Regions:
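Nucleotide/phosphate-binding catalytic cleft detector across ATP-hydrolyzing
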Residues: 1-79, 97-152
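Short beta-strand scaffold segments in enzyme catalytic cores
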Residues: 78, 87-93
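Active-site glycine-centered loops adjacent to acidic/histidine catalytic or metal-binding residues
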Residues: 84
Length: 152
């Protein structure tokens, strides 16, 4: 089954988007890369309160749009958390009558990057396949516990 249209979102290196775009064009597939907006209007409204709305990654913006829409019936403020290459935690403030504000958030290294940087930066750390422990008693468990704790 061949897609008729692709709607994508990427914050990867431009070469990734270029390669995908070329593939779509070569196969006659219509495509559109979505970008962050100053506001979203649908079943609910989400206002982008970033100093420069265009600097907010489209991945974070559309995760916020999806979360606000999915939780619309709850009428509550939200935290939207992504864990991948980076871990992001974003605050979505519920105002009234289906209106939300994207207030901003935090970005840190994701678990894989943390582990990679630790092994490259501290050559003596060779075995990092530890487990989470409330009070680790081995270096590998201490590293894994620290990485997991840093995500929350």
């Amino acid at each position: 089954m061949r897609p008729k249209r692709i709607i994508g979102c990427t914050v990867a290196a431009p070469v990734v988007a270029f390669s995908l775009t070329k593939f779509f064009n070569d196969h006659g597939i219509r495509w559109n890369w979505v970008r962050t907006q100053p506001s979203f209007h649908g079943r609910m409204t989400l206002n982008n309160c970033y100093e420069n709305p265009g600097q907010l990654g489209a991945d974070r913006w559309y995760a916020a749009v999806g979360a606000a829409d999915a939780m619309l019936e709850e009428r509550r403020s939200l935290l939207v958390v992504h864990t991948g290459t980076a871990t992001t935690v974003d605050s979505i403030l519920y105002r009234e009558s289906g209106v939300y504000d994207f207030m901003g958030g935090r970005i840190t290294l994701g678990p894989t990057l943390m582990k990679t940087f630790l092994t490259k930066g501290i050559p003596s750390l060779t075995d990092l396949d530890g487990a989470y422990d409330a009070l680790p008693r081995s270096t590998r468990d201490a590293v894994m516990t620290g990485i997991i704790d840093a995500q929350v």
